[in-house]
């Protein structure tokens, strides 16, 4: 398979290189990744300045790589439309250092890189090691290798798989839904040497449904690998029908609008 790999931790990160090492023997690998840490950039793209690209070489490997001074979404977009010699069969983003659970996916550069794949009709996987302290990516890499070998060509092209691997040896794999994760944020107010005020943001996750066994949050907490199907259609179809009825009742629906 021809696979485009990206991430948000940067092209030199341990996770992306562990993933490359697991996949490069049996697949045609291209890496397009940020030239530095770009975590929590969401789906930001660069429009008001040029993108700088540097070729990245991997000794004793056929992998072709590029480091981009942009976001993860920039990297995948650039790879698909300008750098790769042909469209990839699959986009994989990761292996991220740290979890991407619940509403993390809305902030995550890792997940956004995968979303850019499915926006362009290419199946995608986002994979994260759900720990900042445990840095053994070997199981995560082997799992992705197995998934790609088993059904890489049969993945849906409008839905990505968001995979979170717990630290240590997992006790199993669960197919899950996104949990409801919020953050208790702290903004540390400081003053720079010129007297200007600035803020450092920090925070801890607060999971509203951590006891729900259907969620990715619960699965990882209990030592399972979570696999969550995610798509970019944010439409609330139930509310859509209710809204039509409300507007019709209020005689607003289909009304001719005038200045």
UniProtKB/Swiss-Prot annotation:
Task: Return the Pfam families for the record.
Answer: SurE
Q: Which residues cross the membrane?
A: none
**Enzyme class, broadest EC rank:** hydrolase
The record's family statement is:
Belongs to the SurE nucleotidase family.
Q: Does the keyword Hydrolase apply?
A: yes
Chemical reaction(s) catalysed = a ribonucleoside 5'-phosphate + H2O = a ribonucleoside + phosphate
User: Which residues of this UniProt protein bind a divalent metal cation?
Assistant: 8-9, 39, 96
Q: Which InterPro entries would you find in this protein's record?
A: SurE, SurE-like_Pase/nucleotidase, SurE-like_sf
Cited HAMAP family:
SurE
What name does this protein carry? 5'-nucleotidase SurE
Q: Which N-terminal residues, if any, form the signal peptide? A: none
The terms under GO molecular function for this entry are:
3'-nucleotidase activity; 5'-nucleotidase activity; exopolyphosphatase activity; metal ion binding; nucleotide binding
List required co-factors: a divalent metal cation
Location (main, coarse): cytoplasm
The UniProt function text for this chain reads: Nucleotidase that shows phosphatase activity on nucleoside 5'-monophosphates.
Give its localization.
Answer: Cytoplasm
Q: What is its EC number?
A: 3.1.3.5
Where does it sit, as one GO cellular component term? cytoplasm
Q: How is the cofactor bound?
A: Binds 1 divalent metal cation per subunit.
* Gene3D superfamilies listed in its UniProt record: Survival protein SurE-like phosphatase/nucleotidase
Keywords from UniProt, A to Z, are: Cytoplasm, Hydrolase, Metal-binding, Nucleotide-binding
From which source organism is this entry? Answer: Pelotomaculum thermopropionicum (strain DSM 13744 / JCM 10971 / SI)
